């Protein structure tokens, strides 16, 4: 396990170096001078120190022509909001690996909404899911909240929501999908019993 982690770390460092080179090349290219590169703000939320997934996302986004501002790990919600107000990103990416990060992501997007921010927010990390994003995170935000299964999905998803030709369709598809997930979760939920009823229904193993 230790050897594997070291190999992953080494691979990531090589990828980050490649991304820095790609970013420098893009900055000097005619394409970059002609058009503004979309800006992505990345952060691992407060309480979470894991950053490998976030760093990989950053590498992928840079290699796809995005400008990435990485705030690192354990980033308080207020700091994310202040940075977003300062740099006006086109997309915000929130990462988390542990279960408490899910509640923190809800807190972050709520503060973003209160600050008048509605740019697309992308959610990723081992504990995140399409269902949790639809049930808990998306309802407290004005803009789109998009769950990405892995790092490879972030760039094409962001492009779809930022492109004027595909934005409306992407928003419509996302809203319909999340509405279906919320409806399905509501239908699957079972009624809760009182303590007395639960005791009456207890299984008899003898």
Predicted segments with their positions:
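Arg/Gly-rich low-complexity intrinsically disordered repeat tracts
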Residues: 2-13
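Short acidic loop-to-helix transition motifs that present clustered carboxylates
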Residues: 73-80, 128-130, 153-154
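Active-site-adjacent beta->alpha loops and helix N-cap segments on the catalytic face
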Residues: 77, 100-109
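Glycine-rich beta-strand-to-loop/alpha-helix junction loops that act as flexible
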Residues: 93-97, 121-126
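Active-site loops and adjacent core secondary-structure elements that bind or stabilize anionic groups
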Residues: 152-206
